[in-house]
Amino acid sequence: MTVASDDSPKEARGIPFLDQKSRKLANELLEPCLPFIQFNLGEIEQRAKHYLNTVPTSKDGNTKAHYLLAGSGINAEQTWKKIESLSLQVRPPTTLELSFTDVDMFLKYHREKNVLNSLEALVQNTQIAFDQYLEEEWRSKAAKSRPSFDNILLENKKRVSFYPFSVQRSQKFASTLKMCLEEEALHGFQSKLVSSFCEVAREFAHDTKSLLLYESWKLLSSVILDKDSVTVFGNKGIISKAFDIETEDGSVNSRFYQRISDCSRKFLEAQFFEVLNKEIAKTPQAALVGGVPSIRNKIRAYLNIRLLRNGVWINPDLEIIQDVPIWAFIFYLLRCGFLKEAVDFTEENRDLFEKVAEKFPFYINAYAKAPNGILPRQLRSQLFSEFNQTIRLQESSDPYKYAVYKIIGRCDLSKTSCPSICSVTEDYIWFQLILSREFTEKSVSAHEFFSLEDVQHILLSYGSDYFTNNGSNPVMYFFLLMLCGLYERAINFLYPYFPTDAVHFAITCAYYGLLRTAPSSSVVSNEPGKIQSMLVETKSGKPSLEFDRLLIDYTQTCQELSPVMSACYLIPMCKIDKYISMCHKSLCSLVLSTRDYVNLLGDIRGDGERTPSFLENHRSLIGLSSVKEYLSKITLTAAKQADDQGLLSDAILLYHLAEDYDAAVTVINRRLGSALLRFLDQFVFPDKLISLTKSMMDVYNRNPSLYAKVDYKNRETTNLLLLTVEAFNAYTNKDYEQALSSLQQLEILPLDPLDSDCETFVVRKLAKEFRFLNENLLQNVPGIVLIAMNSLKELYAKQKSSSFGNDAISVDKLRLYRQKARRIVMYSFLIEYRMPSQILEQLNRCEIEMT
């Protein structure tokens, strides 16, 4: 057997040659010189197709190529057929083939297949979630970037509404609301709410608009309270249990509307009598009041001021008897609400009326005695006949006589105005109200039917600009809407101008059950203060107010409100059953946005005792009967929301306040795990998180009752994560011995001194126990392994470069470091499915540097 001779020189085969080759091999392993890949397979394929399309076709086809191949002894046609017969699709080996050939390959194939399927599913889910996130973000951004002109006008209106005293006014209303809520929490139903708000409005009634707002509060108070300041709606606060706004078939409750009509009319009558007294006091010489200042003398004095000039009555059509315009006298008695005085006047002067209207005393007496102000049928027929024959068609008749007959007999309801004597807005509305009636009978003829709904339609037909001088005095139209019982429209109209009063009107109406409310909107506006309308039409055509949106918007726009005051404005939602869940949701959002946990949710002292908060003390007002229910509905829900939003520090505190201590520790572990993951990139650890974790664990450890509520595995995981933090901090400070000591206490890595015989067994045992670790610790194992390996490498390099690197102790240490490094590499490859490839590459490089 002959061997080929080697022509290389002899010295090349010596020790220097082998040393040079080994060094070169080590350098290539540590820093492999791989070529730089400029294009991936997809780009290469795309470029190949592009170049193929750019190659010009040969004029003679493939003739030259055929001749060239034939000259080399190749049959081009046969070769082309063989190429076409080849299958270029590589069929993956089937499970059956793998099972008969190689079990290890079979397992590896299935593992890779599962990993790829999982990754593909994860990528698809991530893409779907990202697309949804982009769509939601675009919707919110688009809405903000395209504000409508209505929103701009609405914002300008709100800006105009802040007159002097607006801040003090809103603060005073807020403190009054809080006081009423506290009294209700202690004593139950609060009947003084409307009177308390009315007093605040009186205190700030300094100009025309604020005075009219005060008048509106007095009007609402007259509807709600009786003469003894006791609410007429019982002690439930919900009108569906006392007066139904709408019955099940949608018909309007006549009893409720009649009360609104009567109260509004009486309010206007009392208001007019005050104006009358002021006019008399202002012009006493023209009034010529003589004798006792009785009601009749005051009415006569007002007639002198209004209808008498230089001793002559200005209207020649007035019927004057004994120097008294009797029809004007009776009309203004009715206008001031003195019906009994008018009846007494006609009875005392019956002989005078025999000359002008013989039967009128009977008419007005029957009108006063009728329960609903409707004359008996016989008298009504006589009055209609007299009205049609002597009053309605006569051009020179007394206008006050026309008005009085129209009021008492409800004549000619197709014309409900009397412009010659009711030229002022309040007089016009009063005239409409005194003509309106609410009937329960279905047999009422059409010409006799004129109700509060008809008055409402008349008012709405004019619109707001007609009564407010093109928007310069919006409170006037609000006042008229309140007079007609259109509370929902009134509040919606007032809110852009005077939000504080509008919100408190809404709270009061809802509290006493006067408000028709829409179903819960379930979506909170992203742009507070820019709500165009809060009215929703019901099936019966009546508007309903989105009460929840109103309160939420006010709490978001009013900057003067503290978190507790904001909660006071959300609590009234619970007066309406359908808003209870929205109230709880809004309170949770308030807690997270303000982060005023101590005042809103309370605190837990070091001894485990609770310090109650505002919401806990007022839990009965938000439909929560017990502390346990309160913690579940409010505190725990807020904690879950904070957890979902990634506010982990807030979630920890909220779970702690909700007395779900195990969940608090779970979030702590998650936060620690996330911080450890970021540590490898930033080498910075949040000190506040560490101090919070240690302080809370110290509280739990010192209180057996709290300690028992935390799961053992959670406590163990927290301790292991804190040890990991210590190891990472030690590594940052280049204290590698301490880093390895802390990691050794984890008992995750094979860092303990081992005999070579049991080394493999221990490593495999730790690798099997790996999957039982908590996920927050599990995800940090690659970082833990890398920190341990780098610490060993640094210690190895330090020991090797020391001046005592050749003694026996140093040699033993170096050998121990290499053994630990080898075990770590072995351990890492046993759990390689959880180890990134770059980590494995770094581990191999470290091991090579240590050998």
Curated annotation (Swiss-Prot):
InterPro entries: Nucleoporin_int_Nup93/Nic96. Keywords: Meiosis, Nucleus. It comes from the Eukaryota. GO terms for biological process: meiotic cell cycle; poly(A)+ mRNA export from nucleus; protein import into nucleus. One of its GO terms (molecular function) is structural constituent of nuclear pore. One of its GO terms (cellular component) is nuclear pore. It is found in: Nucleus envelope. The keyword Glycosyltransferase does not apply. The keyword Lyase does not apply. Its main location: nucleus. It holds the Pfam family Nic96. Belongs to the nucleoporin interacting component (NIC) family. PANTHER family: NUCLEAR PORE COMPLEX PROTEIN NUP93, NUCLEAR PORE COMPLEX PROTEIN NUP93 NUCLEOPORIN NUP93 DEAD EYE PROTEIN. Has a role in meiosis. This is Meiotically up-regulated gene 87 protein. It comes from Schizosaccharomyces pombe (strain 972 / ATCC 24843) (Fission yeast). The gene is mug87.
